[in-house]
């Protein structure tokens, strides 16, 4: 059987437009491996084009024979229907100049639905309204374990629930915030719409107001000595109940150098960006960034994090903090112009041969964004040294973007994943690589990078071997059952729109997926829209945030 895949959020009139026909590469599927003629029809029932579906070989990650239908020259907005040579309908898609603008609003609004510590009122949340949650105080881990009487209580309300659980994690928060803040700074025209959040209609763009809600919570994770707690969770994940029904004791887990460095970096970034609207807050977060940095300098050795015995909430473990320190040095230097930060920037950059990643495990690419695009305050004598750093970042981004293009070029679905790279959160890898492609395009203007970034979003939005749009409630076949305690518990048939789910995982670790996915399933098809499958179908803030960046990038030329 021939299957049809298109971007379910829509294609831009002036953009790359490729749909895919696919068929399993089996002996009993004997479709001739030759080009096919396909006709395209508009909403009025008029034939607008005849295209060739060009045979492109077998995609090894999907084990599909694939054909490509390139209709990039079609610019008329509206619904496009595809028919085969016998007049049978293959499928349809839309062309709209608002495709990515609308998508971006949905992706951003999803973060509002992750808010903790406040009621989500019907005015803003509609049918997904819910009551206030997690308003109690927290205690330090050591006091909790010792059952210390009269333990010091910490007020840590606010922020976003990180994922399908109710924990809040410093490194994850900092990464997501950076993606979103940089997206607004680079592509402000994509963030002009009212998101219908409580802060709407003030002078600040709504996306920055949403980030501010998370930043104000993140400030509370810093201790008196400048250190930053790694996470705020209960000892074990909550049951599948609504947030307001989760009454477990919240615990502040010990500081890590990764958390302190990420905190310093994102607070320095925030101090630059929020100076226009919230000057007092900007000064506060710059001071917090400096205090976190000073603590880091007093602790030059890596201080990692491991969950204590009996704890099953997210660990966000790492083996090095050099990339986090690099990011912190870059943001603080760009923000303050203090040459001491440049010294450290140079030192840390020497330890990283490929500073391009922008996920929570490796944030070195975020240092590159700061150095290449941030507002720079520096003395003339430092200019040459800083330019050397900039050149290293620039070349690293371009080299990595070329590698990503090479991977996508040999994929029948144009996705920048090798057969071995379909692991937990594979969609995050796709989106982070799309961010790198976007940066490469910003640096060079080369169309190849923009087209490949578009191809990655096509994959996320339905041009893949499962046919799913991996964004909840976006598209004709979108994920409806994410691993999300709110969605499972709210007794509402519809799912909250706008969450990116983890995606195919050829080595799932949850019991349901291990049972339902057979060992011989091709990697790209190792996906189920089943809420129990947390290693396939969970959500998290830092899977939405790169999607926001890439959607805004694509929207800028709509």
Which residues fall in each region the model found?
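Aromatic (Trp/Tyr) and acidic
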Residues: 4-91, 98-99, 109-174, 178, ...
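Hydrophobic, small-residue-rich alpha-helical packing segments that form membrane-like cores
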Residues: 290-294, 298-301
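Zinc-dependent metallopeptidase catalytic helix centered on the HExxH motif
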Residues: 357-359
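Carboxylate/His-rich catalytic cores and anion/metal-binding grooves
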Residues: 205-227
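Proline-centered turn/helix-capping motifs that create local helix->coil transitions or kinks
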Residues: 222-232, 300-305, 337-340, 406-409
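Short, glycine/acidic-rich hinge or "gate" loops at secondary-structure transitions
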Residues: 191-198, 228, 280-282
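Acidic, glycine-anchored loop motifs typical of Ca2+
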Residues: 199, 203
């Amino acid at each position: 059987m021939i299957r049809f895949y298109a971007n379910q959020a829509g294609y831009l009139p002036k953009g790359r437009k490729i749909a895919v026909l696919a068929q399993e590469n089996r002996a009993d599927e004997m479709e001739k491996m030759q080009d096919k003629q396909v006709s395209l029809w508009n909403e009025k029932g008029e034939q607008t084009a005849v295209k060739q579906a060009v045979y492109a070989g077998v995609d090894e990650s999907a084990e599909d024979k694939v054909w490509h239908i390139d209709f990039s020259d079609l610019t008329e907005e509206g619904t496009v229907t595809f028919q085969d040579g016998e007049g049978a309908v293959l499928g349809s898609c839309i062309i709209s100049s608002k495709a990515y603008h609308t998508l971006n609003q949905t992706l951003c609004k999803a973060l509002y639905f992750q808010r903790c510590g406040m009621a989500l009122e019907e005015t803003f949340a509609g049918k997904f309204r819910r009551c206030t949650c997690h308003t109690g105080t927290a205690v330090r881990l050591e006091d909790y374990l010792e059952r210390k009487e009269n333990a010091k209580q910490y007020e840590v309300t606010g922020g976003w629930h990180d994922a399908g659980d109710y924990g809040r994690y410093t490194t994850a928060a900092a990464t997501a915030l950076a993606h979103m803040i940089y997206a607004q700074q680079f592509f402000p025209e994509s963030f002009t719409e009212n998101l219908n959040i409580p802060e709407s209609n003030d002078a600040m763009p709504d996306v920055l107001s949403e980030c501010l809600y998370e930043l104000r919570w993140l400030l509370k994770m810093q201790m008196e000595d400048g250190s930053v707690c790694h996470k705020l969770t209960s000892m074990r994940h909550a049951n599948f109940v609504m947030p307001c029904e989760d009454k477990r004791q919240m615990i502040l887990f010990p500081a890590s150098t990764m958390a302190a460095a990420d905190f310093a970096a994102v607070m320095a970034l925030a101090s630059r960006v929020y100076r226009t609207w919230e000057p007092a807050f900007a000064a506060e977060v710059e001071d917090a960034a400096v205090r976190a940095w000073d603590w880091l300098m007093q602790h030059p050795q890596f201080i990692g994090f491991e969950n204590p015995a009996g704890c099953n909430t997210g660990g966000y473990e790492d083996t090095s903090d050099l990339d986090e320190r690099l990011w912190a040095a870059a943001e603080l230097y760009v923000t303050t112009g203090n040459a001491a930060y440049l010294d450290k920037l140079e030192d840390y950059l020497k330890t990283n041969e490929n500073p391009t990643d922008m996920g929570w495990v490796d944030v070195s690419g975020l240092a590159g964004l700061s150095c290449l695009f941030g507002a720079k305050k520096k003395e003339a004598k430092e200019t040459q040294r800083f330019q050397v750093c900039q050149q290293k970042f620039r070349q690293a981004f371009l080299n990595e973007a070329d590698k990503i293009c090479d991977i996508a070029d040999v994929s029948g679905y144009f996705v920048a994943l090798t057969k071995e790279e379909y692991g937990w959160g594979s969609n995050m890898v796709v989106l982070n690589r799309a961010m790198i492609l976007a940066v490469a395009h910003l640096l060079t203007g080369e169309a190849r990078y923009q087209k490949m970034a578009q191809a990655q979003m096509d994959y996320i939005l339905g041009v893949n071997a499962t046919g799913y749009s991996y964004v909840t409630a976006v598209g004709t076949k979108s994920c409806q059952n994410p691993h999300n305690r709110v969605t499972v518990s709210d007794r509402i048939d519809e799912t909250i729109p706008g969450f990116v789910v983890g995606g195919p995982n050829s080595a799932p670790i949850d019991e349901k997926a291990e049972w339902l996915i057979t060992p011989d399933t091709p990697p790209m098809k190792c996906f189920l829209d089943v809420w129990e499958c947390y290693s396939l179908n969970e959500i998290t803030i830092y899977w939405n945030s790169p999607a926001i960046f890439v959607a805004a990038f694509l929207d800028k030329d709509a």
